[in-house]
Amino acid sequence: MSLLVTSLQPQTKGARAFLARGTQRMLIGGEWRSAVSGETLDTLNPATGEVLGRIPAGAEADVDQAVAAARRAFDDPSWRDLTPSARSRLLWRMAELLEANLDELAELESLDNGKPLWVGKYAEIPGAIEQFRYFAGEAMRIEGTTIPTSINYQPAGKKIFAYTAKEPIGVVGAIVPWNSPIVLTAMKIAPALAAGCTMVLKPAEDTSLTAIRLAELMVEAGFPPGVFNLVTGLGERAGAALAAHAGVDKIAFTGSTEVGKLILDAARGNLKKLTLELGGKSPAVVLDDADLELAIPGVANAIFFNSGQVCVAGSRLYVQRKIFDKVVAGVGEYARGLKLGHGLDPSTQLGPVVSRLQADRIAGYVAAGRREGATVVTGGGQLGPAGTFIEPTVIVDVKPAMQVVREEIFGPVVVATPFDDLNEVTTLANDTDYGLAASVWTSNLSSAHRLASAFRAGTVWINCHSMFDASLPIGGMKQSGWGRDSGHQAVDNYLETKTVCAVI
């Protein structure tokens, strides 16, 4: 299969003007700066390999400046004493600005990440908007409690009055990945600022453009200088410096389990708090009573959406034996019908993966599966002028110990396995180091809820997959992470509980 990809240009004036700058800057303490070293990194369009522009190659010195700015802002009364309703208005204003610039942001995300324009326009940027709106409300719901105690040794005639107060944890370092940049960034920023923290954001070096544009909107929204800071650069330099920094009180990270473990090690120096949303190898389970007109495209989209670059992607497909061949054939047919192309082409259904490095990694997994005896039913090719397109791939004849079954591929590759009964599929689904998500496809609600209870996963969808909302917690069990993003409890990730006990 060949693939012709033409270079397409953004249609919005905002995106064209943004790219025309060539070299971008970082935001530190309310000022736009180059890296201390003066070094830059090229940022590429993964569909074509063309250079879109340059970003500062921030490193330890830049992180030091950003953390210092965030600490000053945290201690400054202009932010520290801001009322909850005032913080709420700032977050709501940010949502309005994202909405007003949605088309521009969608084009920048498509060019920088490769994803089809419609993914940003109708899914991810609206998702980011809703994060800011939701946590604008949560900013006014932070409260402590009064506590009746059983203390009985206070002075005669005195009483005990005890209560808890919730206080912002301090300076937060947020490190976000390249697969869904703007919505994952919003999932860190919105609850942290709702809680009253300040932040240093380190976006992925492959996809920093929308983070820079978002930083501009943060300034326009009216956040005080230093409340939000942006440092771009390589993960092993800027990201590592942020994770280890003694002036950072908390790290909020989304990314691979391997990097999550490195961040855990780096945080030891000052025992900073962590939330980690990490990798997954999520099962999609189809029972023989499922509505296959719903289930077949559902499980196909569970893995092929965003070229499989989704932490909760349904990358392990388990199908009851009676319907296994029919479902695999249907998913294969669906895969072959998907149109690959440039993200700005409105007919594109599947864009490239984020980089040649990632494409080579995915292709390596497919080759490993073949070597171990698996059968590629459809797909498996690596295409395009930059070698960054991966054909949607369906693999069968797999065994539980194979690499393609056990390891997170993070591409449009699904491995399919038959099963006989609920006990067997429970064992198969839970036979993983991960525990991020799962889905069950069935017309029997008893079976659905029995499996939902049995699966060791942070989220279980029934007759759907990858349904997100700002109100719904997302996070994993086992090696898929610590803590939860989204939902009202996400604000607690950024709060300390103080106990006050008084004799009155």
Summary of predicted features, one role per range:
Residues 1-48, 73, 134:
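Hydrophobic face of amphipathic alpha-helices that form TPR/SEL1-like repeat modules
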